[in-house]
Amino acid sequence: MTHYHFVGIKGAGMSSLAQIMHDLGNEVQGSDIKNYVFTEVALKNNGIKILPFDANNIQSDMVVVQGNAFPDTHEEVVKAHELKLEVIRYHDFLGHIINQYTSVAVTGAHGKTSTTGLLSHVMNGDKKTSFLIGDGTGLGIPASDYFAFEACEYRRHFLSYHPDYAIMTNIDFDHPDYFKDVDDVFNAFQEMAHNVKKAIIAWGDDTHLRKIEADVPVYYYGFSNKDDVYADNLEISEKGTKFDVYFKGEYFDTFLSPQFGDHNILNALSVITISYLESLNIDNIKEALETFGGVKRRFNETKVGNQVLVDDYAHHPREISATIETARKKYPNKDVIAVFQPHTFSRTQAFLGEFAECLSLADKTFLCEIFGSIRENSGNLTIQDLVQRIDGATLIDEESVNALEQYSDAVILFMGAGDIQKIQRAYMEKIGVTSPF
């Protein structure tokens, strides 16, 4: 048994990885900020100790896993090196772990977490599959056949991975504090493609992904019969979305997803493709798909009277558009109200116009102050720069949440990657409802 200490254990990936190592019989603890982060619930439920940062946390028998947001000058990392302990970065550690399994990486600018959650759930319907999801959920199953994991492109960390398969959901410009432009992002994905050992499954409508060159087969999925795998004859009902799947132009089977929105059907197609390539039992796969309940902070619903309160991680314009589309399709007779907290000043600056455009798809938009990150906590613009670009946009905070009560028959989307949950929590407390977080 190894004793692991995670520096920054509340990070989404770090939390997931800590849970996996705990499940596999290791002693696990970690440190982080005192502020509440939604990932800590799963850690505490697993009995994993969370400590405040302190050099004295580091003991001579530990392996130290260093979160990517923390520099080598961090007091705990310095202490670990002084004790001559093994110190390994998150992405390097994960890269070693996946080599023990048939591994499936899920990468892309958007949709990684939702797709990884679906993939792990569906594959576990037929084969033992350990998984690491970017919503802070991880599970290590002894003697697993497969390992499904989220692979982030930020700072090219995913180049540490050499998976058997890679699902590439899309390529888009994001993380403007690191990537220069979309061509820089494409180059990172092109490098990643050469790391894949068996096959790549990629969205066929993405013009950048269509240019990917690889040493393994690339299977494109989508809604066109020009794709290798495509969905047709979509039917939406209260049960979800039913659709036929075709492989290389030939009918394969009919599936039912409990989810709504084109992006969720695309995610399902990528997972079905993996299942097909690995010859998994299709009846088990269909049954598992029908029981998927979603992942944390991805269109998580709480119904209060005729209001539907949705907690969602959307923090990029394309993700916001997809979340609003899902709300429109699932609740076509309700107004859609957006409550959005921009995440990082650099992203807000880079996509100011796009944020205004996508948020204008809602019937009404409320905006919170910009949430900085550990790396960047201030900038030259303010939330007013976005407010001025959206007709009728209004500022909101924990003290003014009563403004949401007037939308008595609406879907209210609380969106953001920071601490937007505090706004939803304040609103639920205001109307006398217990918050789920």
UniProtKB/Swiss-Prot annotation:
Please name the top-level EC class of this enzyme: ligase
Offer an example of a GO molecular function term for this protein.
Answer: ATP binding
Main location per UniProt? Answer: cytoplasm
Q: Where is the protein situated, by its record's location annotation?
A: Cytoplasm
Q: Is the keyword Isomerase in the record?
A: no
E.C. number: 6.3.2.8
Protein's name according to its UniProt entry: UDP-N-acetylmuramate--L-alanine ligase
Q: Which organism is it from?
A: Staphylococcus saprophyticus subsp. saprophyticus (strain ATCC 15305 / DSM 20229 / NCIMB 8711 / NCTC 7292 / S-41)
